[in-house]
Every structure is written in structure tokens, then in C-alpha cells.
Amino acid sequence: DSMTIFDNVALPIRERTDDSPKQVEARVEELFQMMDLPGVGSKYPAQLSGGMKKRVGLARALALNPKIVFFDEPTTGLDVHKSNEMYRLFHHTQARVGYTAVIVSHDVPKIFKLSDHVALLAQGVIQGQLTPEEFQRSENPLIHEFVDTTMGPIYSSEREEAALNETA
């Protein structure tokens, strides 16, 4: 919280590259533009809304052009509108930057729309790594129960045991 937003996003570039100050500034400004964050460079985190903080976090994550970006519940704390904006931003930045996103989320409908592949982790075991369409048609009881929540709690012991025995 003691660094400006500019310095926060610039930090990995300064620490991991030999870029000149002008190059660092240009990269940070490019990221601010990509994230629709005009005029935030001189502000501090406490001065930003939750959605702006999420976009700053994405800007910093993309500062070094990573091949893979991990997101853990990336829309937690956002309203539906801001959550949708974040998912659109993920899609836009993936197309522009070309990274692979690994997203941990309980927002299943959004994940099905956004993802090329979906995996369910239950009791430390990946139950399936499938396309969203295959995932929704899966006969695996745990996946089926996860997709169709009308069947009851996801960890009913008989179904869980049966599913885990199938994968063993």
C-alpha cells in the first residue's frame, strides 16, 4: 500500500528486465490502457475501487508477458456487472497477449463460457479435464452432481466413494 499504482505495476519490469526508464514507463502505460485505467499511476491502492484493484493486479501479472497466468477466484468481491467486465477483460487480454489462463472459480456458468477446458478437483483428484460440452455430458457421478446441483450435496459419501473407485 506504500507504492503508487505505477510503481507497483512497474516493479516486476524494473526487477526482471534491463529496460530503460522510458521503456518501463511505456510498458506500464500500455498496460494501463489495456486495462482501461487512465490516470491511476499516481494513486495508491487505498484510493481505488475493488474492480480497479483487480485490473491493476491483472496489469502487474501481465507486465512480463507471461505464458501462463493463474487466477484464484478472480471475481470475488465484485458485483455481477464488474464480474462480467473482468471476464471480458480476461478474454480480451488473452487474445492480445496470448497467455494461457488457469482459473480457479466457483462461477461455473462463466467458466463454461470462457474456457476451452474445465477440470473438477475433488478430494485431491482431478475428476476430469474436458471441454465445457464434454464436462456437462460427463457420466462421472461427481462431475454430474457438480453440474446438476439439484442432485444434492457434492460430497455425499456413497456417490463420492463410487466416483473415486471408478478413477482408481
Language-model-derived ranges and their functions:
Residues 105-106:
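H-loop/switch region of ABC-family ATPase nucleotide-binding domains
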Residues 22-39:
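Conserved ABC ATPase "signature" region
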Residues 69-72:
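Catalytic Walker B motif of ABC-type/P-loop ATPase nucleotide-binding domains
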Residues 111-113:
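A short, surface-exposed alpha-helical micro-motif characterized by mixed small hydrophobic
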Residues 63-67:
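A short, proline-enriched helix->beta-strand linker immediately N-terminal to the Walker B motif
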Residues 44-48, 52:
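Conserved ABC ATPase signature
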